[in-house]
């Protein structure tokens, strides 16, 4: 895969996976230790995250093709900002059960749109048809490797700070910001050759 845009997409997708897996894999612990929810309540809140993530991936293609007429950057910007704002609200505000469901639902819907648009649609747009499998393989490899690294880094940060989630929350927020900023500032490299 020689197109430099695929490597940009792979890095962006890696940050998507860091962000998404942070919520899906550490969200229950965060809700319990950071916000005082019971295990049952925390698990129920995070369950909404998974359902809305699926809806976001379904919504991505329709938004990109029908609403924005093939412009991939507008849905990435809008959903990226929604993702960042809802993640910030989830991590840095109190809120009860219902409000936290709204935070994770909006976050997951938005991150689903970012992921599907960047890692799927943009990647397929810029490579020749014969290279799509290799391109998506590179993106997938970077994504899953980053998710694994995120688990290690997050676990160390949470453990080292005695369940003070402020430092790891900054890591997650910065990853969220990078997941949509990277393709937006690299738009010239994300054109078909």
Predicted regions and their residues:
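Hydrophobic core of transmembrane alpha-helices in multi-pass small-molecule transporters
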Residues: 97-119
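Extracytoplasmic gate region of multi-pass secondary transporters
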Residues: 3-60, 115, 119-120, 149-154
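Multi-pass alpha-helical transporter architecture, strongest
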Residues: 90-92, 170-193
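A late C-terminal transmembrane helix in Major Facilitator Superfamily
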Residues: 129-161
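A membrane-interface helix-boundary motif in multi-pass transporters
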Residues: 71-74, 153-176
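C-terminal ends and interior cores of transmembrane alpha-helices
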Residues: 81-95
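Cytoplasmic membrane-interface "Motif A"-like loop-to-helix N-cap segments
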Residues: 65-80
């Amino acid at each position: 895969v020689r197109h430099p845009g695929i490597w940009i997409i792979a890095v962006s997708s890696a940050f998507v996976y860091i962000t998404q897996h942070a919520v899906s894999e550490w969200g229950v612990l965060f809700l319990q230790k950071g916000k005082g929810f019971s295990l049952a309540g925390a698990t129920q809140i995070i369950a909404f995250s998974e359902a809305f993530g699926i809806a976001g991936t379904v919504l991505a293609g329709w938004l990109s093709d029908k609403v924005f007429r093939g412009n991939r950057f507008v849905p990435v910007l809008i959903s990226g900002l929604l993702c960042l704002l809802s993640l910030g609200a989830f991590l840095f505000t109190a809120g009860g059960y219902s409000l936290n469901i709204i935070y994770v639902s909006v976050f997951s819907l938005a991150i689903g749109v970012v992921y599907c648009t960047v890692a799927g649609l943009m990647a397929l747009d810029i490579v020749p048809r014969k290279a799509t499998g290799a391109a998506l393989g590179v993106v997938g490899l970077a994504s899953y490797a980053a998710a694994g690294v995120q688990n290690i880094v997050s676990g160390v940060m949470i453990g080292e700070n005695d369940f003070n989630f402020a430092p790891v929350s900054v890591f997650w927020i910065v990853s969220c910001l990078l997941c949509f900023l990277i393709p937006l500032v690299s738009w010239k490299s994300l054109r078909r050759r």
